[in-house]
Amino acid sequence: MITTGGTIASQEGEDGLEPKTTGQQMLDLIPELQGLCEIDCVDLLNLDSTNMQPEEWAVMAKAAFEGMKNHDGIVITHGTDTLDETAYFLTLTLNTPKPVV
């Protein structure tokens, strides 16, 4: 699982929601996953998705590509504001039969 920030990783901060939840903290909220599969977390970015740019997309693509060498699939957590743009970029750049969600 590759985390990039967004609302899913946000907690209350001084100026509203701030992405600061780690991947392991997210997994700890879903104890039912333990024993079903092995999940490794990579806390790659910690951004509000409105701040995602092509540079971050390239970093995500590289991390996903590296992760696929040792895993059966990749889950990327991401905010909703630019999710469609990131997904489109990853669709064009990751040529893999493995699932990237």
Stretches with model-predicted labels:
Residues K69-G73:
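Short acidic/histidine-rich motifs immediately flanking catalytic phosphotransfer sites
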Residues M1-M68:
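N-terminal glycine-rich anion-binding loop in soluble enzyme alpha/beta folds
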Residues I76-K98:
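Short Gly/Thr/Asp-enriched flexible loops that form oxyanion-binding sites at enzyme active sites
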Residues V42, I74-T77:
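Short beta-strand segments at enzyme active-site cores
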